[in-house]
Structures are given as C-alpha cells and as structure tokens.
C-alpha cells in the first residue's frame, strides 16, 4: 500500500478543483493548471479533500497512485503559493541578464547563450550571478532550471558553473607533481 498515495489532499480556501474523469483542473490566486492522468487510478473529491485510489492491484497502478497524488499536491501548492528556485553562477566573467523574453547568459564561451523564457515562468536577476525563477508548475520550473544549468554545469575542480542555491559541489584535488 502506498504511504504517499493514501494521504488525502486538502484543498485550501481560494483554490477551485474541477474533475473530468482523469483530467484534473486546479485554479487559484496564482493561476490555473490542468493535467490528464493515465488509467489505473481513480480521483475523487470528497468534503474539500481530493482522494487518489488505484483501480488495480498491479505494480504499475500502485506506482501511479503515489505519483499522481504528489503531482496533484504540487499543483494545489503551485496555484495557491507558487514555487521559487534560486540559481547561482560561479566563475570569473560569468553573468546573466534578462532581455525581453530571453535569458542572456555569458559563460566564457565564444558566444552568448540565449534561452527563451517560457510564458508561465517569471525570471528575476537581482545580481549578475543570481537567477530567481518563479512559477506555478513545479515540473516546468525544474525542467527550465535544468536547461539553464546544462549550459555550464558546475565542475569539481574550481567550482565554476551554474548550480542551485544550496547545492553542494564535491571538490576534487588537482594534479600533483
């Protein structure tokens, strides 16, 4: 039995939930999210609580049970409070700036890297080496952050690169003569 899946999702005030078979639409003060789930689970709304239940006893249904519950819980949190990720850029001459709908990264390459900002994600660059991402969809926010990090992942010798704010980068010792 899934320990995550069996917990009910409490719907806070100001958040509206719409169910249409396996499609869940959640709207709140920060925006609206919708997601369609595959079979093997049943989603029901009872007394301001969402319940997710498996329809079969096989391994796939049990796996989707906990996953669907976590995704719906993140959707509720996203439309109510939103999510925020902070990225740090370490390295001499490494910078970030927002120009229109593009994030412009200068990462010691022969060219500047331009990344188009998705419409549902807000980017703030308070300093040249800090990027703050905000959005309602946790999955899209993490995906966009990984696209940014992929441009210059942190390296273990000098620690240069883009990383999450509190991410620990294990350091290696250089060559010995």
Swiss-Prot record:
Keywords annotated in UniProt: Ribonucleoprotein, Ribosomal protein, RNA-binding, rRNA-binding
InterPro entries, per database record: Ribosomal_uL6-like, Ribosomal_uL6-like_a/b-dom_sf, Ribosomal_uL6_a/b-dom, Ribosomal_uL6_bac-type, Ribosomal_uL6_CS
MF term (GO), any: structural constituent of ribosome
Any one biological process term the GO annotation gives: cytoplasmic translation
Gene Ontology terms: cellular component: ribonucleoprotein complex; ribosome
Coiled-coil regions listed: none
Any single Pfam family the record assigns to this protein: Ribosomal_L6
UniProt keyword Ribonucleoprotein, yes or no: yes
Function (record text): This protein binds to the 23S rRNA, and is important in its secondary structure. It is located near the subunit interface in the base of the L7/L12 stalk, and near the tRNA binding site of the peptidyltransferase center.
Subunit structure and binding partners: Part of the 50S ribosomal subunit.
Protein family according to the UniProt entry: Belongs to the universal ribosomal protein uL6 family.
Entry protein name: Large ribosomal subunit protein uL6
């Amino acid at each position: 039995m899934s320990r995550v899946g069996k917990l009910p999702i409490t719907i806070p005030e100001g958040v509206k939930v719409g169910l249409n078979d396996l499609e869940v639409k959640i709207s709140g003060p920060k925006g609206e999210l919708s997601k369609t789930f595959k079979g093997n689970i049943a989603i029901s709304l009872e007394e301001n609580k969402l319940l997710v239940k498996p329809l079969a006893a096989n391994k796939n249904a049990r796996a989707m049970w906990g996953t669907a519950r976590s995704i719906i819980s993140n959707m509720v949190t996203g439309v109510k409070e939103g999510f925020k990720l902070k990225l740090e850029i370490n390295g001499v001459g490494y910078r970030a700036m927002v120009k229109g709908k593009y994030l412009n990264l200068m990462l010691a390459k022969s060219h500047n890297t331009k990344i188009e900002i998705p419409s549902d994600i807000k980017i703030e660059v308070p300093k040249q080496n800090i990027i703050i991402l905000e959005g309602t969809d946790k999955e899209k926010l993490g995906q966009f952050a990984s696209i940014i990090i992929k441009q210059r992942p942190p390296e273990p010798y000098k620690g240069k690169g883009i990383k999450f704010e509190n991410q620990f980068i294990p350091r290696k010792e250089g060559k010995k003569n």
